[in-house]
Amino acid sequence: MTHTHDHEHDHNHEPDYITLVEENGNESLFQILITIDGQEEFGKNYVVLQPTEFEEDEQGLIDVLAYSFTENADGTEGDLQPIPEDAEDEWDMIEEVFNSFMDEQED
């Protein structure tokens, strides 16, 4: 089955960063790899993050995180929400846009 999604995503050339604070107070710095405008299809925006301190696995892969987000009025901060595991259409769209983004980065 093939899906075609026409979603806008931000191609910042200078990296943006975000600090995530865990429940225990630990802070971790993440690079924002891509933001995805999913407003039309899902009524949400999405962000894909990569830890700034990471280790590749045996296959050279790095874990990334994806969240939906709501920006505050001035666009400088916002709230991240986990994407439900059973939201298959959302995950499919995020994966497709992210894979396209990564393919463009390799070119």
Curated annotation (Swiss-Prot):
InterPro entries: UPF0473. This is UPF0473 protein LACR_0139. Belongs to the UPF0473 family. Signal peptide: none annotated. NCBIfam families: PRK13678.1-2 (NF010215). HAMAP family: UPF0473 (MF_01448).
